[in-house]
Amino acid sequence: MSQVIQGAVEEPVYSNKSLTNENDSFLSLIESFSQERGVPIDINPKIGRKPILLYELYKKVIKRGGYDAVSATEDGWTNIAEEFNQSDPARSAGILQNVYFKYLISWEIHDHWHLLLPPPSTLELSENRQNVLERVKVFNSCSPPKPTNPITIIDNDKTHSFKKFYKSLVKEDEENGIEKKINEAMNSSASQPLPNSTNFASTTFPSVPFHPLPVDSGLQKYIDRNSNLTPPALGAGVPGPPLLVRVALALKSQQDKEVDWAIGHLIKISFERHQEFKLERLPSLAECLVYSLGFQVTKAKQVSDLTDISLCMDRAIGIALVLRNSVLSVENAKHVAQTKLVISVLEASIRCAKTFNNLEFLHYCLDISEMISSYLHVEDEKNVFYLALCEFLNSSDYSILIATLRTLARLALNDRNNRLLQDLKSNVIANIIALVETDNEEIVAAALDFLYQYTTYRTNTSNLLASQEAWMLVDQLIRLMMYQAQERFMTVTIENSESNPAVKHEATSSISLPMEELQQLVAMREPERSVKWMRCCFEPSSDDYVLQTDIWQLYCSDMERAQGPNVMGISPADFIKVSSHAFYNARAMTVSTPQLPVEYVINGIKRRKFPTSVNGMRYQPCRWCLDSGKECGELLLGTPLLHSHLQEMHIFPQILETGKCRWSDCKYEIQRLTPASELSHYQLLSHIVTHLHDDSLETLVEGRKLSPSREFRIPLLLTAVDDQGDATGIALTATLVLRNLVRSKQGKMLFSAIESRVLEVSSLNPAVAPYVSEMLLGQI
């Protein structure tokens, strides 16, 4: 196929008038067109088992305005799929769109829109299928204009002369007089020989054979290829930096358009992909955000035009929103808290929000302060950030109060110098106490968290108890110890056997641990030491219990014997808690006894008759009666050591001669008719061994005994607990605040007034019973 490339094309190149059938003609044109572009085509595509006529598909899409118009409509391709009678139009719509884009989109651009086609790699073979027409128009606008006098190349197979070839390179109307002379010279040179042909040939035209250039020659392809080339844009094809790096650089530039662009992207990323938004991956981004926030706040204070102030505040709000979204993650909160100038920038932002009365900006700043306050260290009560927060304690807005109270409580928790929360006015504390009476759970929890940190200082506690609001606070704390309590029932089984005596708590006057075992326990750390000590001195028993005060006093006496007084490594409340770790069924609870209406006990354990070692071996006392009538009483670890002790210290030949057993109150005596012999000695020694306890020989000979029993359901009011059964939530915080008040100088007087009410609460709510036990132990 030969063509003449001219400035304008009057009729479509791909036309075939010999074809009468429209569909066949269209398929022939499309197939020829695709071969020219070098793109494979399937002229009979199918969706499922139903064939799709490309001609019908093309007409329907063009009728609706083209590919982009159909794709912009929500159900555009679905409606076309319905017209093709597809069983599942919604599913077939995507397949139909894919068929059109692969086989017909280039024909639409060429035939319908009459635009220059880009390469197949950027059109039908591209993954980008949006705004196709706009991208092609941009491609056409970037192409260089065609020259006014294009070179015309004519395919001529009849002549090979230089004259014909030269005429094919120029227009006929451009020949002038000089060209005519050249033509005449060329005509005459054909009939006359050349003088000095060797030198003349080297100075005139070279004797190179010339051949006609067909249309599909290399020169024609080079001209076609270079006619569409455009100079590459600056930076085209170079992979730029990551998005977050560009955002950080845009923030550093402090140019308004760049900052607006960066803020827009960061707001979207921090909201939609907050789980992947890690500031540690780009360390400079957190610093840029904090610095940009301070820059916009400072700029808003310096400008005077209302429009400029509004623009600066909008940018500051956007940056604060990004920081607020990011610090919801613990890792990001730690990273932002370690950023320089974050405290001063937050203080300036809070005061700026108050100055311009911008509540949205203020809430974002307070949220940021709340989330990072756990990792901040404010060690001076004159810190401007701390003082700015204290100004909000008189606010009537609950949302501002909640954020402020939580932030101050967390700052006080990290206060190493004990300087914070000690310069607050009495009216501020009275307002916070009044918040405890509200029905808002969030404000009550925030107020209790603040009061817990506030009452850890003794001076604050003394001032609080001396105020008029003290008893109102105590009443509310006792009420909140049962906050949202739910009724539960505990089943207790009591055996109804007459042979068994009534269950009593174990006395604490049994044999104490030897000093060598205490030395091993002292080398351990709490709470492992307490757990090991309980297992050495007590054993599980579902029918017994031990008073909490007795077991604590016994532990204190053993530790004082081993390491001296006032060196306890665990508090009474924590000691009571670890009982459940030492024994699975041990529970701290309250019971009624004939002596007292309420007794704090540990149910499910009893005192061992003889203690065991840390490794679990049982100690046994030597009960051999001496000549003075007293028992030896030495503790020995295990039966073999006790047997060796008897042989070495007590069983002498004189004892064997008497034939009497002197073990405690044993009356055994060998009956012999003859003088003492080895047989009588053996009988006495065999009898003495029966007094020695051997764990390995213990067996159950009577089997299980069934006895009638009674079950009692004890009603309880249980508040919120965690997975391990420990108290949590408002009830726990209220109990801890009350415990701090009881520990003060006026604590005994306060506890004596509320003791009955607190004991009643602890008997109904076992979750707070360990903390009430600590209050009781503190009064001893």
UniProtKB/Swiss-Prot annotation:
Molecular-function annotations in GO: DNA binding
Any single Gene Ontology cellular-component annotation: RSC-type complex
InterPro entries per the UniProt record, alphabetical: ARID_dom (IPR001606), ARID_dom_sf (IPR036431), ARM-like (IPR011989), ARM-type_fold (IPR016024), Chromatin_Remodeling_Comp (IPR052406), DNA-bd_RFX (IPR003150)
Pfam short name (any one): ARID
Superkingdom per UniProt: Eukaryota
Residues annotated as domain ARID: 20-112
Keywords: Chromatin regulator, Cytoplasm, DNA-binding, Nucleus, Phosphoprotein, Transcription, Transcription regulation
Localisation: Cytoplasm; Nucleus
Modified residue annotations for Phosphoserine: S696
Residue numbers carrying Phosphothreonine: T230
SUPFAM superfamilies in UniProt: ARID-like (SSF46774), ARM repeat (SSF48371)
GO annotation, biological process: chromatin remodeling; regulation of DNA-templated transcription; transcription initiation-coupled chromatin remodeling
DNA-binding region(s), residue ranges: 530-609
Subunit relationships: Component of the RSC complex composed of at least arp9, arp42, rsc1, rsc4, rsc7, rsc9, rsc58, sfh1, snf21, ssr1, ssr2, ssr3 and ssr4. The complex interacts with histone and histone variant components of centromeric chromatin.
Function: Component of the chromatin structure remodeling complex (RSC), which is involved in transcription regulation and nucleosome positioning. Controls particularly membrane and organelle development genes.
PANTHER family for the chain: AT-RICH INTERACTIVE DOMAIN-CONTAINING PROTEIN 2
UniProt name for this protein: Chromatin structure-remodeling complex subunit rsc9
Organism whose genome encodes this protein: Schizosaccharomyces pombe (strain 972 / ATCC 24843)
